[in-house]
Swiss-Prot record:
The keyword Transmembrane applies. GO terms for biological process: CDP-diacylglycerol biosynthetic process. Its EC number is 2.3.1.15. GO terms for cellular component: membrane. It comes from Arabidopsis thaliana (Mouse-ear cress). Widely expressed at low level. Expressed at higher level in seedlings and leaves. It comes from the Eukaryota. It is found in: Membrane. Its main location: membrane. It catalyses: sn-glycerol 3-phosphate + an acyl-CoA = a 1-acyl-sn-glycero-3-phosphate + CoA. Pathway: Phospholipid metabolism; CDP-diacylglycerol biosynthesis; CDP-diacylglycerol from sn-glycerol 3-phosphate: step 1/3. This is Probable glycerol-3-phosphate acyltransferase 3. Esterifies acyl-group from acyl-ACP to the sn-1 position of glycerol-3-phosphate, an essential step in glycerolipid biosynthesis.
Length: 520
């Protein structure tokens, strides 16, 4: 009898183990696409997604490595990556990625590498699929995983702008503070991912994986620990819409880098073909702007590709008004270093002056109009601006630094105390290849990069004059009200959003410093 009982108990035990194993290792439900998740409540689920396979619309990683090569390594390194790409395309996917990593990162100083947070987020955000983003928004905890992109390239974009909780990318090997251009072993990367997924399964018990049909990224680990796996096909990506700027979880206000165009293979080819012509065009434009009178230089510059559009012509509207003893104060938003110069072009005046907070010595020497460096002392700076106004017209950019995106930084109120009449000037700039601004690069090259662009375009709009705050202001509030009103007027004219961010905020985000340029 005892033998029968023991056999019966053994059978029950084996059956129990079989059922338990089936429960623990039950095969997940495989789905063709994540769109069905939009109808589900995912607030208690952990979503694990493949960055390049399921989040980004483009399948090519070349543009992102080209951005690293150009912005962190320079023109020669980026050209080397470009000429090697035909060979890279013949390699296996994994080997091709290794070569691009080597060319882009070898010898780059780890401490000075800021492209991952200052340059790449703009281009990654422009490549995010709206449909996939809508799914991620519904999830509880979100984990982004990449088998091809280094951690330093994707972490800033995913954490800072898409609010992804955990980012698992490939770590880079570093020796003596410099990148070797080699990623850590894939096995170590898989172990990190394995431990992470196991932990999430134990904590929540609800894990959903989203990856691509065209990659084997952690397919075994996905199938072991995810209750559901959704596969994204290339055809799905082609039908995706791009994530609109208005839906960014965090607005992209600041970004750095010289390239204004996404360096796809064809765009990079055009960029390097334009190079020899760009040097000649920049030299000619610089000569014309410095040496030829405005009446002749403006049409010549327009013929060379530099465009200037002026609306609400201030010169024509002031012809019938009596002259003033003091010059006119023009207050404009700051887009590039050449803002005061283009305002002078629009006014058809060459004796106009401007003040700067921090300008390289080379730029001061090359400037065709007089520039005066401010000391950041309110009293002495105010006196300097009043003196300049007695000599003629003055252009100021109270933001203190440039901003590329449709936002206005806080306006310093100092300009409101030096003139009774203030003319707000709304400025917009469009470039094709190169930005004429930088936060972490050589600021002396800012005008050069602007002139290297094929069709740099300025639009100047003179707004209605406003009264300053030179009268008695005992509580000190009027100057801030005037500054905010001028900022608001320019923002409305340009359809830009006004912010309270400052120069210091920008440089801390992009360059890790306070934005003061040392005299060279």
């Amino acid at each position: 009898m005892s033998a029968k009982i023991s056999i019966f108990q053994a059978l029950v035990f084996l059956f129990y183990r079989f059922i338990l194993r089936r429960y623990r290792n039950s095969k997940p439900k495989y789905q063709n696409g994540p769109s069905s998740l939009l109808q589900s409540d995912l607030s208690r689920h952990t979503l694990i997604f493949n960055v390049e396979g399921a989040l980004l619309k483009s399948d090519s990683l070349f543009p992102y490595f080209m951005l690293v090569a150009f912005e962190a390594g320079g023109v020669i390194r980026s050209f080397l990556l470009f000429i090697l790409y035909p060979l890279i395309s013949l390699m296996s996917h994994e080997m091709g990625v290794k070569v691009m990593v080597m060319v882009s990162f070898f010898g780059i100083k780890k401490e000075g590498f800021r492209a991952g947070r200052a340059v790449l987020p703009k281009y990654f955000l422009e490549d995010v699929g709206l449909e996939m983003f809508e799914v991620l928004k519904r999830g509880g905890k979100k984990i982004g995983v990449s088998d091809d992109l280094p951690q330093v390239m994707i972490e800033g974009f995913l954490r800072d702008y898409l609010e992804i909780d955990v980012v698992v990318g490939r770590e880079m090997k570093v020796v003596g503070g410099y990148y070797l251009g080699i990623m850590e072993d894939k096995t170590k990367h898989d172990l990190v991912f394995d431990e992470l997924v196991r932990k999430e399964r134990l904590n929540t018990g609800r894990v959903i994986g989203i990856t691509s049909f065209n990659t084997s990224l952690h397919r075994y680990l996905f199938s072991q620990f995810c209750q559901e796996i959704y596969f994204v096909k290339k055809s799905d990506k082609r039908s995706w819409q791009t994530l609109p700027r208005s839906q960014y979880p965090k607005p992209l206000i600041f970004h750095d880098g010289r390239l204004a165009i996404k360096p796809t293979l064809m765009n990079t080819l055009v960029l390097f073909m334009w190079g020899p012509f760009a040097a000649a065009a920049a030299a000619a434009r610089l000569f014309v702007s410095l040496c030829i009178p405005y009446s002749l230089s403006i049409p010549i510059l327009a013929f060379s590709g530099c465009r200037l559009t002026v609306t609400n012509d201030y010169v024509s509207s002031q012809k019938q008004k009596p002259s003033q003893r003091k010059g006119c104060l023009f207050v404009c938003n700051h887009r590039t270093l050449l803002d005061p110069l283009y305002v002078a072009f629009a006014l058809r005046k060459k004796n106009i002056k401007t003040v700067t907070y921090s300008l390289s010595r080379v730029s001061e020497i090359l400037a065709p109009i007089k520039t005066v460096r401010l000391t950041r002392d309110r009293v002495s700076d105010g006196q300097a601006m009043e003196k300049l106004l007695t000599e003629g017209d003055l252009v100021v950019c109270p933001e203190g630094t440039t901003c590329r995106e449709p936002y206005l930084l806080r306006f310093s109120p100092l300009f409101t105390e030096v003139s009774d009449v203030i003319v707000p000037v709304a400025v917009t700039v469009h470039v094709t290849f190169f930005y004429g601004t930088t936060a972490s690069g050589l600021k002396a090259l800012d005008p050069l990069f602007f002139l290297l662009d094929p069709y740099p375009t300025y639009t100047i709009q003179f707004l209605d004059p406003v009264s300053g705050a030179t009268c008695q202001d005992p509580d000190g509030k009027l100057k801030f009200e005037v500054a905010n009103n001028v900022q608001s007027d320019i923002g409305k004219a340009l359809d830009f959003e006004c912010t309270s961010l400052t120069r210091k905020d920008k440089y801390l985000i992009l360059a890790g410093n306070n934005g003061v340029v040392k005299k060279n």
